[in-house]
């Protein structure tokens, strides 16, 4: 009873884990679809490729055109210009920041606490009630610390998003490369097996080998380029990751310094940190600008509609996948690039079957004189060596019946005047009229005969061995085709790979990019706010310039 309870408890736990996994997976897909829909609805425009006129670009991948008809320059521009505004913000922030700090002491409020808004006037004299009130300084510190807290949150989120994006890109690269390498290894193994001597007798073999050689050559070239692309992509991705991590850390350190300067009153630290933000704020806008268009492209690639019109992530409701992998809606279909190979192999199998059947048909016609009761004085009749089914035609479906269910009639020979069967000493065996068949034996099948069941007539033995040898070649060829080739060329081999890639690109990467894109924009805004409070704090955080005895805000 205790054992049963343990088993039931284990099953319940496994069921809960599976349900949780399915829920998390569905939740991730739902979030990704929401993000994709959000990006899909964003308007895109072209300018440079439309003769200097700002024109709205049609929605969808390549504006809804097929890949062959895509105007890539317009599509790429429309995607890049999505970040045009934020690039401009980054440039303006950088230029204004540099100008601001160059002329800070002259016309942007001055470097010391003074009267005047832009142009600095006389210095504040706290002894006569001039300076910054404690209440206003407190509010400034509070706002600063709130923004620093916000920076901590978006810093953590950005790091997580950046790490997930890196893992996703590396995972995608490995998935594609591993699939290519595995397929190539299988094709090479198939080609090596086809090079065996036993297959050389078939007419189509050379043509099949030629196609396989071409596929392998293309595959090796693709693998080589893919390895380079994969390596370069990982290198660039790792560089991107490190740059972003370093930038995020610097931004967080600077934000923290402004927070510390607010807490303990370090105006010089506040000023230095604010100067550093001249570089860091544009950096964050650039990070945002670089990644923002990516999800727009991903949205074009991944968005789809099912037959009910409900938006979903799926395979062949996706127009790009449908176009690239046309004909693979059914798992049992053959991938288009392998259709010619399949046709050749089918012809080869049919050729092998026909050759085997020709041998069998010849054997079915083979007959020898048989003397009733082995009496040389009796009138002989023609006895077929094989009891071939009269109503069957040899084919790939009936071949096994001929080989494993057809009786073979084996026999010995002797001189007609000899007393015992097998005695050829009393006549000239080359004179057929002086010899006769004897001791006829029924052997259960052609296969049994070829394996030693037939012991007398060497012609019958050789014929059955030839037939079974052809059948063995046909069987090994069929096994090679079924076990090695078919799994590679059928859509059932491709679709799980598409599902895996789609899950990486359309779910994992979309969610990861969103964790990086949105927080970097918020981070840039918060840093801008901290830059302002840091500039204000470069004076107000100095306790010497507060109104003495001030209680008001």
Curated annotation (Swiss-Prot):
**Signal sequence extent:** 1-26
Q: Which residues cross the membrane?
A: 80-100, 137-157, 243-263, 274-294, 515-535
Instruction: List all annotated glycosylation positions.
Output: 162, 171, 178, 195, 315, 332, 351, 396, 405, 462
Reply yes or no: does the keyword Signal apply.
Answer: yes
Give me the Gene Ontology terms describing cellular component. membrane
Q: How does it sit in the membrane?
A: Multi-pass membrane protein
Q: Where in the cell is it found?
A: Membrane
- Keyword set for this entry? Glycoprotein, Membrane, Signal, Transmembrane, Transmembrane helix
> InterPro entries from the entry?
DDB_G0292058-like
This one is known as: Transmembrane protein DDB_G0292058
Q: Which organism is it from?
A: Dictyostelium discoideum
């Amino acid at each position: 009873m205790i054992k049963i309870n343990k088993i039931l408890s284990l099953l319940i736990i496994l069921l809960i884990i599976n349900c949780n996994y399915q829920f998390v997976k569905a939740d991730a897909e739902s979030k990704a679809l929401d993000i994709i829909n959000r990006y899909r609805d964003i308007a895109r425009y072209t300018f440079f490729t439309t003769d200097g006129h700002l024109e709205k670009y049609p929605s969808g991948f390549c504006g809804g055109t097929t890949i062959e008809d895509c105007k890539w320059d317009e599509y790429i521009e429309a995607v890049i210009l999505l970040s045009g505004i934020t690039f401009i913000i980054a440039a303006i922030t950088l230029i204004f920041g540099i100008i601001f700090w160059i002329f800070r002491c002259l016309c942007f409020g001055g470097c010391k606490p003074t009267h005047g808004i832009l142009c600095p006037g006389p210095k504040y004299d706290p002894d006569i009630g001039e300076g910054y009130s404690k209440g206003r300084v407190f509010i400034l510190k509070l706002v600063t610390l709130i923004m620093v807290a916000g920076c901590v949150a978006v810093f953590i989120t950005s790091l997580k998003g950046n790490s997930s994006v890196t893992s996703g890109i590396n995972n995608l690269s490995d998935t594609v490369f591993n699939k290519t390498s595995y397929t190539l290894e299988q094709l090479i193994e198939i080609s090596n097996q086809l090079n065996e001597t036993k297959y050389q007798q078939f007419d189509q073999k050379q043509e099949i080998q030629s196609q396989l050689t071409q596929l392998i050559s293309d595959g090796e070239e693709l693998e080589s380029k893919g390895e380079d692309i994969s390596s370069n992509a990982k290198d660039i991705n790792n560089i991107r990751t490190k740059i972003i991590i370093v930038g995020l850390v610097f931004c967080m350190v600077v934000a923290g310094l402004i927070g510390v300067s607010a807490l303990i009153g370090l105006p010089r630290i506040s000023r230095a940190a604010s100067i550093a933000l001249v570089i860091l704020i544009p950096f964050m806008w650039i990070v945002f600008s670089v990644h923002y268009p990516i999800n727009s492209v991903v949205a074009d690639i991944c968005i789809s509609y099912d037959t009910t019109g409900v938006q979903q992530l799926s395979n062949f409701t996706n127009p790009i996948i449908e176009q690239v992998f046309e004909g693979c809606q059914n798992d049992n279909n053959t991938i288009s690039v392998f259709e010619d190979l399949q046709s050749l192999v089918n012809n080869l199998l049919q050729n092998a079957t026909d050759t085997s059947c020709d041998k069998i048909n010849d054997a079915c016609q083979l007959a020898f004189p048989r003397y009733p009761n082995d009496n040389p004085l009796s009138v002989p009749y023609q006895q077929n060596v094989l009891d071939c089914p009269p109503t069957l035609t040899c084919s790939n479906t009936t071949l096994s019946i001929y080989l494993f269910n057809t009786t073979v009639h084996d026999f010995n020979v002797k001189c007609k005047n000899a007393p015992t069967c097998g005695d050829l000493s009393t006549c000239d065996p080359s004179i057929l009229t002086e010899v006769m068949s004897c001791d006829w034996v029924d052997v259960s099948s052609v296969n049994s005969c070829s394996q030693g069941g037939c012991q007398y007539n060497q012609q019958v033995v050789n014929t059955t061995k030839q037939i079974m040898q052809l059948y063995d070649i046909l069987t090994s060829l069929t096994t090679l085709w079924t076990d090695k080739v078919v799994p590679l060329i059928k859509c059932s081999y491709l679709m799980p790979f598409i599902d895996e890639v789609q899950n990486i690109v359309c779910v994992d990467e979309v969610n990861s990019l969103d964790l990086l894109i949105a927080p970097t924009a918020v981070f840039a805004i918060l840093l801008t706010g901290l830059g302002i409070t840091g500039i204000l704090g470069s004076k107000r955080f100095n306790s010497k310039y507060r109104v003495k005895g001030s209680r008001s805000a």
